[in-house]
Regions:
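Hydrophobic core register within WD40 beta-propeller blades
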Residues: 75, 183, 246-248, 327-329, ...
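Bacterial Sec-dependent N-terminal signal peptides
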Residues: 1-23
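Generic detector of short, well-ordered, non-transmembrane alpha-helical segments enriched
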Residues: 13-15, 71, 275, 350, ...
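Beta-rich catalytic cores
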Residues: 69-71, 177-180, 242-244, 323-325, ...
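Beta-rich carbohydrate-recognition and catalytic domains
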Residues: 21-66, 77-176, 185-238, 252-324, ...
């Protein structure tokens, strides 16, 4: 009888040891009070995965003068510990203070840039003085005059309909515009992709060209040389309906991988589109080198090709079976991971993995979920949650850092009401112990 008891006791000891090891491996992170992290309990079914609201970064982007809202919100780490931020549609002007957060007179540049300087600890600085806005101000001298702390669009589309005189007065192109893609540092310069958009009479926001802009990194943030626009190739891709390069991954194999999601009706009777992640790559890390597209042939066999995919090729070239949006790829250990939002406008953000940066990305797990309400005054519910962008340059301890975009039900709700200045601006979240999802 003692041998079965010995076996049972040994199994018990083994299970107990494994449990203790798991508790040690997935211990709660050592947080500092100044980080302003607020736990969101029960956000993930795995008890080791810990999701936090980042109230420090929320406060940094709760702004009342100049930039006071915007979407897009992507970052790129620059030399010297600086962080480059890009925004799409933004509000510039004035909002009231924390007691009411009412957005007042603001204009609406279609893209905008900012640089975050490092703090004394070398991490991205968490003071307002660490934000250097690369804004072309309309005027900042007379608070009673039109255009006070308004801003012009950073990069105009060459087909923009406004005259130079109208632009100087602070008017904004609305028919042809650029939205920001991802960016990377190559040979001491910043290379950035821009998505040309045609906003016709029905506000359809149709994709058009893909441009590449090159910026200087000479000097320091705030100096005339730093992030000076050196060149723009507006016709790098004359027509880019898929939108490759919304996000990038610079791999050790010498290529930069360019991700997008291709949306299409998978079946004739479908009410909603499918959104399939797809990938291209530049031949070298220089984004101006020739691009290759990862495409499946009619038999399902993938290959790299030099020609831009046809709609039929794109439909069969998904690098994940999941229908998602805003794919971000990074590498940790021997695995490549992709984070992405469930399609369409789902509150859930997923993570999946692959052995290569071109996929397939499977083994999909729920990572975190956007709260149903925002931490703001006035109306707290939002209409859409979209573009949860990953910010590796903001991570302190290997956690995953996300910004979110949320809009309000009616355009007028962005103005003149309590809390209106806290729609259409980023909120930030951090996910710790995320790798525990793949040890279940």
């Amino acid at each position: 009888m003692r041998y079965p008891l010995l076996i049972i006791f040994s199994i018990f000891c083994f299970v107990e040891a494994m449990a203790q090891n798991g508790q040690q491996q997935w211990a709660e992170p050592q947080l500092q009070a100044e980080w302003g992290l607020e736990r969101m309990p029960h956000n993930n079914a795995n008890p080791h995965v810990l999701v936090y609201k980042d109230k420090c970064y929320d406060a940094l982007f709760t702004r009342s003068l100049g930039w006071n809202g915007g979407d897009g919100v992507q970052t790129t780490l620059l030399p010297g510990g600086h962080v480059f931020w890009s925004f799409n549609d933004s509000f510039y002007g004035r909002a009231t203070d924390a007691s009411s957060r009412i957005r007042r007179s603001s204009n609406f540049p279609r893209n905008s840039l900012m640089v975050q300087t490092p703090g004394e600890d070398g991490q991205p600085g968490a003071e307002d003085t660490n934000f250097v806005w690369l804004a072309d101000w309309v005027q900042r001298e007379d608070s009673t005059a039109e255009g006070y702390y308004h801003c012009r669009t950073h990069l105009r589309h060459p087909n923009g309909e406004k005259t130079e005189a109208q632009i100087r007065q602070g008017e904004i192109d609305q028919t042809w515009l650029y939205w920001a893609g991802d960016a990377t540092v190559v040979d001491g310069c910043l290379q950035m992709l821009w998505a040309g958009v045609y906003n016709g009479t029905q506000n359809l926001m149709q994709p058009r060209n893909r441009a590449i802009a090159v910026y200087s990194l000479e000097g320091k943030p705030g100096s005339p040389e730093y992030l000076k626009l050196l060149s723009v190739d507006h016709n790098f891709i004359v027509h880019d309906p898929i939108g490759y390069g919304c996000t990038l991954w610079e791999d050790e194999d010498g290529h930069t991988y360019l991700y997008a999601c291709y949306q299409f009706r998978k079946n004739a009777g479908d009410l909603l589109n499918t959104s399939s992640p797809v990938v291209a790559r530049s031949r070298t890390h220089d984004l101006r080198s020739p691009w290759e597209y990862y495409v499946a042939d009619a038999s399902g066999k993938f290959h790299w090709q030099n020609t831009y995919p046809t709609p039929e090729e794109a439909r069969r070239s998904a690098i994940s079976s999941k229908s998602v949006a805003t794919p971000w790829v990074f590498k940790d250990g021997d695995w490549y991971y992709m984070t992405a939002q469930g399609f369409v406008f789902a509150r859930e953000v997923y993570i999946m993995r692959s052995r290569t940066p071109w996929g397939p990305f499977e083994d999909c797990r729920h990572l975190w979920s956007m709260p149903r309400e925002l931490d703001k005054l006035g109306t707290r519910t939002y209409q859409h949650f979209y573009m949860p962008h990953l910010h590796q340059s903001l991570s302190r301890q290997g956690e995953l850092v996300f910004s979110t975009n949320t809009d309000c039900k009616e355009w007028a709700d962005n103005f003149n009401a309590v809390g209106s200045a806290d729609f259409y601006r980023p909120y930030f979240f951090r996910v710790y112990n995320w790798k525990a999802l793949f040890e279940e």
